[in-house]
Structure formats: structure tokens, C-alpha cells
Amino acid sequence: MSQNERDSLELERKNTPPDGPRLPERRPRFSVWIYLAIFLALLVHFFLFWTGTDTSTIEYSQFLEYVEKGYVERVEIVNDTKVQGRFTEAAVREGLVSVPVRQTDLLRGAQTPELIRRFTTTKPADHDLTSFLLAYNERARAEGRPTVQFTARIEENWFGGLLTWIFPLILIVALWVFLLRRMSPSSQVLNIGKNRAILYDAMGDHRVTFKDVAGLDEAKEEVAEIVEFLKNPKKFTRLGGKLPKGVLLVGPPGTGKTLLAKAVAGEAGVPFFSISGSDFVEMFVGVGAARVRDLFRQAKEKAPCIIFIDEIDAIGRSRGRGIMMGANDERENTLNQLLVEMDGFNTDKGVIIMAATNRPDVLDPALLRPGRFDRQILIDKPDRRERLEIFKVHTRDLILGDDVDLEVLAGQTPGFAGAEIANVCNEAALLAARKGKEAVEMEDFEQAIDRVIAGLEKKNKIISPEEREIVAYHEAGHAIVGWFLRYTDPVVKVSIVPRGLAALGYAQYLPEERYLYTKEALLDRMTMAIGGRVAEELVFGRISTGAQNDLERITRMAYAMVVDYGMSERVGYVSFNLSGQYGEQAFFDKPYSEETARLIDEEVRRIINEVRERARRILEEKRDKLEALARRLLEKEVLGPRDLVEILGPRPYGDYPSPNGKDVEELKDLQKGEPTSSSAVEAPAPQTERPESSSAP
């Protein structure tokens, strides 16, 4: 036996309880409804078959014949439809009538002579049996023969009537219960107020710790205090300190807010309740508040623990919003109950409330006040160093080739969130497996980045030569205008290969990680965005629908400059912030007059016209470079930094486009006429511009 087998047996022996292995609990396979149905079936069978007696059934015509012959002694008419009678002893004894013969029954006993003489028949509705018997008795008296005694009675079938009323009721109740169970397992009447929180075992097989959360160093430092509190609460309460009752994780989608909350539970080793904000609200009134109470009740029972509410803006929006459209009373009641539960929560219990949202501006102020969610932790998109750590986490289970450089990949993916980086790694592994490779190479990662940014490459999409030429000049216009402006991002790739749902071409840039933009920087970006449309107009004398996304972007930026950032001299240093502070009411109650609105529209048009003329001047001056770049695009379809430097010359502002900083000197030497290596630098990078769309606006 090998050492591994001995270790496995020893581990199994340790995990086996002293009283032997525990068998899984078996639940009853039959529900109470099945037992009830069986009982009712037996009851019906008993009343219908066992309560009756064994009597012979004869035809009505034969019954009339027996009466005429004097074989019948007594007749009883039941409900004017059924006839029960008794033969004479002489007729039975002499065998003049047919009677049933059966063996002795243990349940009903022996067959007596009285039972043998009985018979039953069915009376037709159109026959007057009473008149027939009266006429027979008169003839029998006249002839001196025995007469037939007859009576009539009304028999009520109480059991049949009971079934007529109860059976439909039982059927309706069973159908109602069945429909409730089909709609949702938790939609039963008794469980409608139960919360839908999922309890994760922090010490289970899928435990998440801070090692699984790459980057986010500042955020992990903030939540480390929470972990320490859950491990050793007396350390804080001994000196009279209190931990914040609520921690709100704020950040863009995909940055790791939920993952960080799971890591907190994994590090502290406590139960972790996870629930979405939309799970509280139901179609029934009062269910949301009941689920909040039930959630906090369970949390108190399992303290110390963590309650994590994902997308809390679903129930935490400011009260009073949307009055013009009608307020949601159920959502507000749920929020009120949440506020009450959090305000009365005792931090000594060891229960921490965490929530995540990417819309903190719409949350109710009462939810953010001290004593509730009084600590906000920003989970922002990672920088280059943090992206490198994220790549290390997501590639540790991949078989990487020798040419894979994670530092280069981190430089090629500025603006990527953690979820997008994970998607890039997974796409690269799938591409390598599709090609039958033994390891994931750098080429696979570059193609995966292109795929995540611009979508799937459509090699077989048929485009007419005219449209292909328009797309080439459009993308060349973007690249040239951006190349010769000071505050634009370096162009690293231009392509006219169709990608995605409707993209006919795209340009990729290497954006700098900046947080402030000047007025000049915004104008340069708008000029670059409109360069494609201006190039079409300059070369072909007409425009196409491919610039729809460009026009949307520059219009949005122009309105932001005038309305939000106060960058218009005519409007002044004001900020109306329509997308943030005023929320839904901004569409109905704008904080400025009609005259100001007209002035804003005029300023937006003026700014767009200025950047358009600026782009036209640049393209007219660089017309030869525009033609050369478009011809090279039509020839190669994809151009990298080396091709751009060869055609456009040195970039007048900023560094040469290089995602990793290793090819800057090589590209500079290219402009001086010095020999360089034959390998082209075509490293893709995330675009600041969405691919051009072929759809009409």
C-alpha cells in the first residue's frame, strides 16, 4: 500500500464517528395529501360496497311476472326509482325464483334465509307500479290468493351529498397549494415573510480570504479592523470603543465589492448572510418589512456574523423621489424597517452589516448617517500595480507559455476592472484550447483583450469596397487628429476588421490614469472623436451613419462642460448636476429657466462647431498623411504603433505609444533612420472610443 493510500485511510478513520458512519436522514416519501386521499378512497369504498347486503338483482319485466304468479310477498318502493322486495318462502323453497348463492364471509357473516329471499330491481319512470299492485291485490282477493304488501319511502343519500360539497372544495384547495409551490418554493403562505438570504459557511471548501482578493490594498486595510473586531470583540469594547454598525462598499461594477465582503467573512471565520436588495420586495404588501425583521432575527441567533446586502440601492433610494410618477410605498416601508433595525442594533452582538452599491448618490441620507452606514469604502478600478496582482491571481491555475509577461498585460489593460481581467484570462485559455496548444501564450492574451474590448472578430462578414473605404478614412481621421493633439491618449492600434454586433472598425488608445481633466483636454478629446466624421466629409463630400457613437459622445461631453463643470463663459460658473443631485426630478423640474436652457443649447452647438472646424484644419494640413494611412489600412486592415510612427512621423506631444514602455526607444530610432528589429509592435490596449457602428441612428 502506498503512502498516499495510507494517509487517505487514516484521514477517513479520523473523520468516522465512534458510533459508526452516520446515514443520511431519510424524509418521508409520501406527503400528508397522499395519506388523506387513500383514507377518503377507503371510506368511499366502504360506504358504497360494504354497507350493502347481498341481494339478487332481477329485471323489471321479470319482477312484474313474479308478481302475477304470486311469488312476491312484499315490495318497497324507494324514491320512486328503486324497488326492493322479498320472495315468498314457497317460491324460494321450490326453486321457482333465482336467488344468489355465496360462501360464508368473515366480515359480513353467514347468508341467512331472510337474505336469500330479498331482491332488487329498477323501476322505469313511466310505469305506475302502485296502480299495478292495487289491481293485482284486488284480483288476488277475489281469487282467494295472498296479496302483495307494498310501501314507499324517500331515502336521503347523505354521504353522496357530502361528497358533492366536500370534493370540489378539496380539489380547489389542492390546486391552490400546487400553484403556490410551482410559482416558488418560498411562496407558501407560511413562508412568505421569510427572508431569502443565503448563508455561506466561511470555513467551508470555498472559503475566500484576502489572498484571493488582489489589489484593493487601501480597502483591505479598512476592513481589516472589522475582521479584528469579529475575531476579538473584547479588544475594542474593553476601552469603550464601538465598531461602525454599517460598512458601505462603493465602486463601479466588477471591481470586487462582493468578493471583498466574502473575504471579510472568510478571514473572520463567521457565518455570512448574503442577500440582494431586490429580494426584500415582493408583490404582497408588508413582505419586505417582514423579511428584514426575519433576517436580523437570524443574524442575532448566529452572531457573530456578517449581513451583506448587494445592490442596496434597490431598497435604499431616497424617499420622496419620483412623486410625479407615483411613489413606491412598499419599497419605502422596507427601507423604514431596515433603518429601524440598524438603529437599534447592538454592536456588542458581533454582527456587522455590509452593503454594496455603485449608486451612492441615490441612497437615502438617513441610511448614510452616523450609526447606520457610517463608513464608506471606495472600491475603485485598479491601477497598473494592482492589475498585475489581479493577473497573478487569475493566471495561477493556467498553464502559461514562456513568452507571457504579466507586466505587459497590466500595461495593456488600463481601466479594466477585476471582473474584466478575469474574463480576459478565461478567454485566453479558451482560445488556446481551441487552437490545441499546450500552454496559453501571449498571442492568446492579446486576442482575448481585443475580444473583450471590441467583441468577436467577424472574418467572414462581407463588406462592399465602398463601405470598407469609408471605414478606413473614418478610422484614419480619428488616428491623425488624436496623434497631433496635446491632451489626447496615444493611439496604439487602428483596425477596419469588423467586430462585435455592428462594429465595422475601431481605434484603440492607451489612456493615462488621470483623475482631473482641464477644459483644453476635454476639447482635444472631442476634436479627436469628431475627426472620423470630418474625414468622411472632407474626402467623400458626404457623411454616413457610422459616426453615431461619436456624435453621442461629443454631445454628452459638451453638455457636461456647460451644465456640470461650469466651463462656459456665457452660462457662467454654475453646476446644475442634472445626473446626480436631482435624480428623477430633473426631468420635470429643471433648476433653470427656459432662457438659460436656450443659452445652454447654443453653447453646446458652439463648442461642437468649434471642435469640428479644428478637426477640419488638422486634416486639411495632414491630407497626405490621411491618404497614406487610409491606403495602409485598406492594405493591412490592422495597424500597430510601428506602422503609425512610419506613416505619421514623431508624435509632437507626449511619449510614443507603448503599452509596456520597452519599445519607446526603438520607435524613436525609427524616426532617425536607424535600423530596428523586424518585429512589429502591435500590442492592443483598451479603447476610449467605442467601435464605429454600422447601424443607422
Curated annotation (Swiss-Prot):
Family assignment from sequence similarity: In the central section; belongs to the AAA ATPase family. In the C-terminal section; belongs to the peptidase M41 family.
Encoding gene, per UniProt annotation: ftsH
InterPro entries according to UniProt: AAA+_ATPase, AAA_lid_3, ATP-dep_Zn_Metalloprotease, ATPase_AAA_core, ATPase_AAA_CS, FtsH, P-loop_NTPase, Pept_M41_FtsH_extracell
Domain of life where this protein originates: Bacteria
Residues of the active site: E475
Record's function text: Acts as a processive, ATP-dependent zinc metallopeptidase for both cytoplasmic and membrane proteins. Plays a role in the quality control of integral membrane proteins.
UniProt feature, compositional bias: Basic and acidic residues: 662-672
EC numbers on record: 3.4.24.-
Name of this protein: ATP-dependent zinc metalloprotease FtsH
Location in or out of the cell: Cell inner membrane
Self-association state and partner proteins as the record states: Homohexamer.
Chain residues that bind Zn(2+): H474, H478, D550
Positions of transmembrane segments: 30-50, 159-179
KW Protease (keyword) present: yes
Membrane-related topology note: Multi-pass membrane protein
Cofactor: Zn(2+)
Keyword Cell membrane: yes
Binding site for ATP: G251, P252, P253, G254, T255, G256, K257, T258
Free-text remark on how the cofactor is bound: Binds 1 zinc ion per subunit.
HAMAP family: FtsH
Keywords: ATP-binding, Cell inner membrane, Cell membrane, Hydrolase, Membrane, Metal-binding, Metalloprotease, Nucleotide-binding, Protease, Transmembrane, Transmembrane helix, Zinc
NCBIfam families: FtsH_fam
Major place of residence: membrane
GO biological process: protein catabolic process; proteolysis
Single GO molecular function: ATP binding
